[in-house]
Amino acid sequence: MKVVHKICCGIDVHAKMLVACLILTNGQKEIRTFSTMTDDLLRLRDWLQAANCTHVAIESTGVYWKPVFNILEDALTVI
């Protein structure tokens, strides 16, 4: 399989929390849980940037994804 992004993140968003899985090309992954409060979403953004993650895929059920997208869109490519 061709590697398109060396580091990426998948995010599953719920009403009060989200689960983010950071995946590296060497097969390593790190899973963290964040609340959907703004301060925690900013911590999520900072964590992703510190890991040199450039692309994020968000599971977009309902409207819960919108605050996450709004925080991440200026710093990362959000799909």
Where are these regions (language model features)?
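Phosphate- and other anionic-substrate recognition elements at nucleic-acid/protein interfaces
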Residues: 1-79
